Amino acid sequence: DPVQLSGTVVKRATLNNADMMAQMDIRVGDYVYVEKGGEIIPKITGVELSKRGADVVRPVFPTTCPDCGADLVKEDDEAKWFCPNVDGCPTQIKGRLVHFLSRKAMNVIAGEATIEQLYNLDLVRTPADFYDLRKSDLLRMEGWKERSAQRFLDSLKDSLKVPFERVLFALGIRYVGE
């Protein structure tokens, strides 16, 4: 239930990962203690065990990728679980394509819906594929007309002028950030 905390109504609180939930022994239906980290972000700091019901259960986390079905893995020194199917998981491929075109990366005018259509039509699988697109490819897409296709192609052409550090960021290399 929402609670009043430092002058604001809090409906959700950060817990970060399954390891923290296990360490704090948090279960579905528990009453928890919440505080604001840095006076901004609500976070769970503990469990009120005296209010724990007999019917509470530990949360169950997915063990396989919901998109491609690969078994999730976890690096020893990290908290998050992830899909290792880098080259075959559609969600990961599309995510990398969205990142590549994003404003902070190549700054191409395109949204997730555009990338979804391009992916579903088998027109793009890698960032390089964007630069092979022709206007006729784009006009095959639902809702695309001459003007929108030309704007997208012009935006792609303009992206060839971004500074190298943004290209490097756009490639999405692990541990390489802005």
Cite the ranges covered by each PLM segment:
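Conserved nucleotide-binding/hydrolysis modules and their immediate coupling elements
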Residues: 1-55
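Structural signature for extended repeat/solenoid scaffolds and their inter-repeat hinge/linker regions
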Residues: 32-178
